[in-house]
């Protein structure tokens, strides 16, 4: 038997969120049933894929560097087809009714308006003189400012709605 996919799911914070990853070869096709799907955002590390909802017309093509929101698909079965070797990291709620906002951090000074989480998706960005690695995460607090250097990495910021 040939294994052509690797995936992982890790609960990260007192029933708040989890990080998942999917690493597959070109041509891989997978279906995520609605009852198993808690992903709200995905960051694509490499490759590209078709991402669609089963039994609905159309699909999105997501590719390396894309930050893809799937809130509108949270209560649907979805399908992924890898158009090339493909890897993505996902941010998951652990309670479907709990909504989160998410975005990629691009600024040098992060001014936080709500308590939230920073997650390293790729590379080795620096937050407050601390170098991070992929999957590192930590809390940020309302009213605080954080010095950020993302020239060597990608950070996501997530806050509860």
How should each PLM-predicted stretch be described?
Residues 1-37, 85-115:
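A short glycine-rich, His/Asp/Glu-containing loop-to-beta-strand
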Residues 30-36, 53, 79-81, 108-112, ...:
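Short histidine-centered beta-strand/loop micro-motifs
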Residues 19-23, 41, 59-61, 67-69, ...:
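Conserved hydrophobic/aromatic beta-strand scaffold that supports enzyme active sites
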